[in-house]
């Protein structure tokens, strides 16, 4: 017996068991979807039951030891059971029960104590007999869960928040006043824009209490922690607005996976209806909410369809017109595109001031990725090889960058103030960031120099965002002076590559360390390298970062070169970089890379300055 194709790609096919025994010739095996032949076996098996293979982390199958045939199988993705089927002729043998029990045990072992599953409505009683409880239902599918916590725990947390807010409102109201209705907005805020702010303002004016639920799924450009903090800071002045935690029960990959694919499919309506039913059954009652607010959607087909189903399903849905800037609706995607183009000036008019530190931090992280991905580079890690480094590669460098990002956010928030932050707080965050980087890379120092330089620049950029008038027509000068003021608080260092190189060179030359350059506000960078890079970008030069790196190498006292070789070698490297810049070619860069690898040379200080140039270009370009 075959089921009809299910519109929900991770829907279950399940038959009622009539026996408690499993044939002795069957054993549970793990099949790997990453192995083409095993994946094909799973897909063929599921297709016989009218199902499709969805994303799973683990797939278990009951396999007949004699024939090798899959008799029953099921998958697990995080805490969701998916793609369960029993082969024709084997229904009624309790095989699906065996598979589901195995998957629940697996999920529990991975720390998931509440497990969800999708199935067809006709299987509800069966799963209720197995201790699953209904979460939501749609015409073609239902969502159930079993275990401790789950929707009950989340609903209780929401009820407590609602009770606290109602008590506070009652205490400030007259004795005869009745508390007005509450409303809800569910938003991704990736990032929080002026459009989101306008929606919240308009909604808050229509209800006594407005709850803003942040989509918790961490698959956006901005992390859940960043997005929730962004919204909280962005609505802090609105007394009747409360930002609450999101969950797996509101626009998540568990309830609404196609939302994150941003495309309509035959599964979309079912997922939307399940998500809306979950909201109506559990979230709205827990918050005492009677109104759902959404922004109008003129372009995205999936969101538009979701809004229409919401209006047809929920009792009171109010659609707010999108806020526009320069005749176009403000959207998070416009802001993200500005970041991709490395332009804070294009993003800033679209967001509240409280969002700016998060954008600045992301530009810093993007600058590190741009430097890393600039290929080829002489002696440095790039997307093609490890240069002269035996202890790090592209993947390790990326781990270091990801580890540093939350600290760039903290530094930007620290700098976003009228006064420069205390030196001790700057150092404290920097040391935490360094420890996080080393933990992520297995002890490899991937970005210590870049952390110092970019950390100062991030603080300066965030500080500058609060002094738009003071910056006037010369943002680079303001940024340079701010960086110099921050660096002046750092004492002379001992034991670093830069300090040792200065001592070594002192009989014949005077070198500047990374701290010396910072104390000067990176004067050469602002006067030379940044304008050079900007000119190459305006000329649409695809080799702009490569040429800029060579320009920096030709002028910077790169103490990394001295550390690996000598002052004389550093002088030779400057000459070679200048010659290649004057007669630039990619084969020439590749030849320099081979030479540097043979000589164990790595211009790491120049790479740090390239990251700085890319970042500051994004901050200062108009």
What do the predicted segments below correspond to?
Residues 406-463:
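Long, hydrophobic/aromatic-enriched structural stretches that serve as scaffold segments
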Residues 90-102, 195, 199:
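Conserved acetyl-CoA pyrophosphate-binding loop and the N-cap/start of the following alpha-helix
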Residues 57-72, 447:
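Conserved beta-hairpin
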Residues 119, 124-132, 136-359:
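Nucleotidyltransferase catalytic core that binds NTPs
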Residues 357-423, 461-594, 600, 622:
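Phosphate-rich cofactor/ligand-interacting catalytic cores and adjacent structured alpha/beta frameworks
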Residues 68-85:
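Conserved beta-strand in the GNAT
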Residues 11-14, 21-53, 63, 69:
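Short amphipathic alpha-helix that is part of the acyltransferase structural core
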Residues 107-119:
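Conserved GNAT acetyl-CoA-binding A-motif
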């Amino acid at each position: 017996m075959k089921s009809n194709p299910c519109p929900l790609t991770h829907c279950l096919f399940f038959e009622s068991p009539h026996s408690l025994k499993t044939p002795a010739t069957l054993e549970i095996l793990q099949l790997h979807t990453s192995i083409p032949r095993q994946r094909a076996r799973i897909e063929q098996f599921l297709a016989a039951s009218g199902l499709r293979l969805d994303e799973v982390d683990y797939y278990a199958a009951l396999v007949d030891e004699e024939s090798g045939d899959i008799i029953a199988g099921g998958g697990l993705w995080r805490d969701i059971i998916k793609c369960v089927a029993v082969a024709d002729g084997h229904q009624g043998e309790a095989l699906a029960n065996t598979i589901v029990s195995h998957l629940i045990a697996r999920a529990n072992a991975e720390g998931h104590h509440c497990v969800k599953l999708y199935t067809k409505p006709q299987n509800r009683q069966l799963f209720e007999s197995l201790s699953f409880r209904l979460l939501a239902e749609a015409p073609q599918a239902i969502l159930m869960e079993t275990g401790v916590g789950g929707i009950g725990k989340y609903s209780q947390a929401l009820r407590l928040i609602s009770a606290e807010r109602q008590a506070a409102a009652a205490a400030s109201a007259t004795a005869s006043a009745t508390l007005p209705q509450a409303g809800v907005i569910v938003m991704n805020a990736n990032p929080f824009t002026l459009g989101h702010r306008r929606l919240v303002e308009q909604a808050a004016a229509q209800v006594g209490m407005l709850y803003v639920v942040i989509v918790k799924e961490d698959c956006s450009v901005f992390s859940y922690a960043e997005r929730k903090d962004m919204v909280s800071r962005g609505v802090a002045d609105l007394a009747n607005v409360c930002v609450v935690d999101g969950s797996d029960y509101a626009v998540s990959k568990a309830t609404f996976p196609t939302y994150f694919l941003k495309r309509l499919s035959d599964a979309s309506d079912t997922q939307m209806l399940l998500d809306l039913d979950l909201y109506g059954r559990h979230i709205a009652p827990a918050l005492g909410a009677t109104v759902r607010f959404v922004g109008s959607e003129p372009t995205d087909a999936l969101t538009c369809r979701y809004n229409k189903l919401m209006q047809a399903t929920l009792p009171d849905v109010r659609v707010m017109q999108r806020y526009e800037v320069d005749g176009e609706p403000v959207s998070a995607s416009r802001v993200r595109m500005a970041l991709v183009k490395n332009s804070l000036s294009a993003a800033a008019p679209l967001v509240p001031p409280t969002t700016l530190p998060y954008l600045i931090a992301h530009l810093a992280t993007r600058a590190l990725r741009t430097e890393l991905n600039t290929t080829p580079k002489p002696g440095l890690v790039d997307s093609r090889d490890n240069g002269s480094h035996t202890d790090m590669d592209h993947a390790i460098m990326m781990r270091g960058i990801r580890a540093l990002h939350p600290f760039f956010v903290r530094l930007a928030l620290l700098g976003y103030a009228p006064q420069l932050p205390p030196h001790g707080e700057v150092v404290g965050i920097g040391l935490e960031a360094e420890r996080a980087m080393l933990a992520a890379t297995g002890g490899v120092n991937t970005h210590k120099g870049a952390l110092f330089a970019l950390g100062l620049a991030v603080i300066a950029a965030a500080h500058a965002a609060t002094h738009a008038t003071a910056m006037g027509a010369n943002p680079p000068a303001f940024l340079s002076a701010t960086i110099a003021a921050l660096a002046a608080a750092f004492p002379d260092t001992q034991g670093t590559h830069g300090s040792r190189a200065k001592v070594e060179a002192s009989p014949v030359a005077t070198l500047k360390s990374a701290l010396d350059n910072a104390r000067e506000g990176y004067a050469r960078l602002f006067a030379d390298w940044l304008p050079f890079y900007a000119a190459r970008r305006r000329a649409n030069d695809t080799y702009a970062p490569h040429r800029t790196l060579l320009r920096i190498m030709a002028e910077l006292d790169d103490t990394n070169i001295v550390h690996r070789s000598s002052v004389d070698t550093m002088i030779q490297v400057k000459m070679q970089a200048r010659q290649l810049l004057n007669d630039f070619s990619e084969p020439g860069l590749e030849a320099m890379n081979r030479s540097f690898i043979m000589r164990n040379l790595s211009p790491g200080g120049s790479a740090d300055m390239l990251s700085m140039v890319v970042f500051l270009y994004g901050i200062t370009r108009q």
